[in-house]
Amino acid sequence: MENIPPKVQNQLAMLQQMQQQLQTVVSQKGQYELTIREARRAVEDLADVPEDAAVFMNVGSVMMQKSKEQVLASLNERIETLELRVKSLEKQEKALQGRFEQLSSQIRGALEGKQQPPGPA
């Protein structure tokens, strides 16, 4: 690492930081997508439930009885919100991926340029 110029060392540190950010974004996106799938499954299951059936919903740490209509509205709102977050995270992921690839390329170029033996003068 001592042979590597300080500028490249800084770029390597930035690259590691970007990689961590990218992993965080991908992880969050995966969690949101899982929650969306679960909510959609709940909506599908509620389609078979009679309108006047007792439906329960978690509100914080308490389970409360709500109308089917209220639960469906809540689930659909949650799905919509999470889908917006996923789209935002996808944009963030794409931007980070682009910057990551660009910085990787710069670092490779700097290291390859440094490692090349001096040519004939």
Swiss-Prot record:
List GO terms (cellular component aspect). Answer: cytoplasm; prefoldin complex
Q: Where would you say this protein principally sits, based on its record?
A: cytoplasm
Q: Which CDD domains match?
A: Prefoldin_beta_GimC
- Compartmental location: Cytoplasm
The record's listing under Gene3D superfamilies reads: 1.10.287.370
Keyword RNA-binding found:
no
Pfam families, per this entry?
Prefoldin_2
The protein's superkingdom reads: Archaea
Signal peptide range equals none
Record keywords: Chaperone, Cytoplasm
Gene Ontology MF: a single term: protein folding chaperone
* UniProt subunit comment: Heterohexamer of two alpha and four beta subunits.
What family does the entry list? Answer: Belongs to the prefoldin subunit beta family.
The record describes the protein's role as: Molecular chaperone capable of stabilizing a range of proteins. Seems to fulfill an ATP-independent, HSP70-like function in archaeal de novo protein folding.
Query: What PANTHER family does the record tag this protein with?
Result: PREFOLDIN SUBUNIT 1, PREFOLDIN SUBUNIT 1-RELATED
What is the name attached to this protein's record? Answer: Prefoldin subunit beta
